[in-house]
C-alpha cells in the first residue's frame, strides 16, 4: 500500500467552490486535483493500492481532511474539474455534520471520506499504524538509495508544509528523501515516486 499526505495550506474548506476559478478563489484547489489525478490514474486503469489524504487549511473552517481510497473510488475521472466536484461533495458532507460526527471518517461518495483532522494528528495516526514516514524534500537522501517500506509520503503544496511542521517531522524522525536537485511540482513528485516503486516492484518479481 502506498499512502500520501498532502498539506494544502490555502485550499478552501467550504463547499462554495467556483469550478471556473480553482487556482484563485479556491486556494490552489487545482494543485490538489492534479495530485489526486497523479496519485491514482493510469492510462486505462486506476491504482487500487493507493490512499491519498489531503489536509485543507484554507478558510473558512480548517482543518478538514479528505481521504481518497483507490480500491473504492467510482465515477472519478482524471480531469481537475471532475475531481473538484467530488471534493465539493466531500466538503458539503462535512458541513452537514455536527462537530462530534466530524471526529470520525464520513463517506461522501464511494471511496472518498471526510473528517476533522489536522496534519500532525494524521501523521501520528499513521505512526501508530506502523507506517514509515517519508518527507519529500529536495535536500533529502536520493530516493534511489533508500529502501522504502510501508510508506506514507509527505508532500507540501506551492508554499511547502511550513517550518513548524518541518520541525515536527524532524522530531518524529521522518526520513527526508529527494527526487531531484530541483524544486518540483507536488503532482510531479507523486508521479516520480510511483515510477521508482513500480520499477522496484518489477525487479522483485
Swiss-Prot record:
It is found in: Cytoplasm. GO terms for cellular component: cytoplasm. SUPFAM superfamilies: alpha/beta knot. GO terms for molecular function: S-adenosylmethionine-dependent methyltransferase activity; tRNA methyltransferase activity. Belongs to the methyltransferase superfamily. TrmY family. Homodimer. Specifically catalyzes the N1-methylation of pseudouridine at position 54 (Psi54) in tRNAs. This is tRNA (pseudouridine(54)-N(1))-methyltransferase. It comes from Methanocaldococcus jannaschii (strain ATCC 43067 / DSM 2661 / JAL-1 / JCM 10045 / NBRC 100440).
Amino acid at each position: 500500500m502506498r499512502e500520501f499526505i498532502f498539506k494544502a495550506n490555502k485550499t478552501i474548506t467550504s463547499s462554495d467552490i467556483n469550478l471556473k476559478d480553482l487556482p484563485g478563489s479556491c486556494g490552489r484547489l487545482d494543485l490538489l486535483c492534479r495530485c489526486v489525478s497523479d496519485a491514482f490514474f493510469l492510462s486505462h486503469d486506476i491504482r487500487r493500492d493507493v490512499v491519498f489524504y489531503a489536509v485543507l487549511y484554507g478558510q473558512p473552517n480548517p482543518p478538514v481532511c479528505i481521504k481518497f481510497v483507490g480500491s473504492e473510488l467510482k465515477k472519478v475521472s482524471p480531469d481537475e474539474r471532475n475531481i473538484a466536484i467530488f471534493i465539493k461533495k466531500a466538503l458539503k458532507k462535512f458541513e452537514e455534520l455536527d462537530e462530534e460526527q466530524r471526529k470520525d471518517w464520513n463517506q461522501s461518495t464511494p471511496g472518498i471520506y471526510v473528517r476533522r483532522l489536522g496534519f500532525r494528528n494524521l501523521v501520528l495516526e499513521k505512526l501508530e499504524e506502523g507506517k514509515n514516514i517519508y518527507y519529500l524534500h529536495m535536500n533529502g537522501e536520493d530516493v534511489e538509495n533508500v529502501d522504502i517500506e510501508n510508506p506514507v509520503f509527505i508532500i507540501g503544496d506551492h508554499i511547502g508544509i511550513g517550518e513548524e511542521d518541518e520541525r515536527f517531522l524532524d522530531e518524529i524522525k521522518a526520513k527526508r528523501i529527494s527526487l531531484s536537485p530541483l524544486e518540483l511540482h507536488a503532482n510531479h513528485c507523486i508521479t516520480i515516486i510511483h515510477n521508482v516503486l513500480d520499477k522496484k516492484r518489477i525487479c522483485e518479481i
